[in-house]
Amino acid sequence: MRVLHVCSELYPILKTGGLADVTAALPPALASFGVDSRVLVPGFPAFINAIKDKQLLINIPSRFGAEEINIFLAKVPNTKIDIYVIDAPSLFARPGNPYADSSNQAYADNYLRFALLGWIAARISEGLDAKWKPEIVHSHDWHAGLVPAYIKASELASGKKAVKTVFTVHNLAYQGLFPMSVFAELDLPGIFLSMNGLEFYGQVSFMKAGLYFADKITTVSPTYAKEIQTYEQGCGLEGLLADRHNDLYGVLNGVDPQIWNPKKDSLIATNYSSTTVATGKAKCKLALQQMMGLAEKEDALLFGIVTRLTEQKGLNLLVEAIGEITSRGGQVVLLGSGDKALEEVFLAAAKKYPKSIAVQIGYDEEQAHRIIAGSDVIMVPSRFEPCGLTQLYGLTYGTLPLVHKVGGLADTVTDSSLENLADGTATGFVFDEFSVESLTLAIRRAFALYNRKTDWKKVRKTAMQQQVTWDSSAEKIYQIYKNLVRENN
């Protein structure tokens, strides 16, 4: 089975969030089911610079404002995965963030940049590469939302049955919304600009295009699949998603054990397993405390946070609750960037309590590994969270997740309540209500369990035994593919 994945990010070449981890890990995981995956990406500088031994597949005349378009075929470095890169310098050759300028303003021509991505995907589905034609095209998030629309448009124009499409929602809150006037530049049938198409409250929505035109929709956890059909979490698209509930699947993301594995992680102070976790984490914790200038206290309960500093991620709650940690002798290490006001608040807290709070603004993949390995608790207090990968990394490293009961967090972490401790299912700390009070109670439960060393070790062992790799999830995705291919034959 041949599957083309269409996305804007791919770890380790380009990453701004969890999307890159998923698009990198899913194709190799699917290979064990006989799926021949290839990936199509925009020619951002990171991709152009990373790929070696590329071959020119085709040159395409000017389109979507791009003066020159070359499609290259290469290998994703250090993998067996083939990658198509759209080299269109006038659209993609921009430094820094792939979506926004140095002032963090979204590029005004993003609709053209990602229209080209979708249009090229449709051409590949028709046989642009004479040696490889996909049976399924699987697009990811709003950047690739037009892929199913262009494929459907091609089917309508030719009268021939097109390849089947799958669209994955990684985060419904980011929708790719543009003024209605841009539709004329997208080269799509006029009938697509309607409620039964791209139109969304007087705007054009790339996300809605994917949701409406894809044959099947997946999102990244069972709970999130239910939540996005509700007014509270549907971001205005709950009606469409509810109408398509029979085509909507919630499939948890997984962890790539080649990258996130305490037994062989070269980025952490020492490797460890579930049997050596006590000594291994103690060494990682000391190394982290030394690196971040914290007091070197083995018995201090250390909370790690690796996140974007936004309201969605619950950081406004943490601002109010952080005193609960320091007043009890705990420590906090935070890595992230985002809202400038939140950055300043956390930097001020670190300046006031330099031996208890350490803050690093920005994102550093290596440091993320060190924080997750060296912390006792990893905090993910998100207001909403489609899946979340950080808590899965925490489970893998024996770093107990403290999470809000929402989305994929609710699906993957079991609270250390008395009954869950009794039956051996507890893996972390879960708070139900998105409030400072509820978060504070969860923090207090973490301290209480930490003081009961035998119980803490049991929960940590249970956490590390959780099956959070891609094996099970990849099989579910494969079954969706298989059913679609069967429909097309």
From Swiss-Prot:
> What's an example Gene Ontology biological process for this entry?
glycogen biosynthetic process
An example molecular function term from Gene Ontology annotations? alpha-1,4-glucan glucosyltransferase (UDP-glucose donor) activity
Keywords, ordered alphabetically: Glycogen biosynthesis, Glycosyltransferase, Transferase
Q: Where does ADP-alpha-D-glucose bind?
A: K15
Q: Which InterPro entries match?
A: Glyco_trans_1, GS/SS, Starch_synth_cat_dom
Function field: Synthesizes alpha-1,4-glucan chains using ADP-glucose.
User: Could you tell me what this protein is called?
Assistant: Glycogen synthase
Can you name the source organism?
Francisella tularensis subsp. novicida (strain U112)
| Gene responsible for this protein | glgA
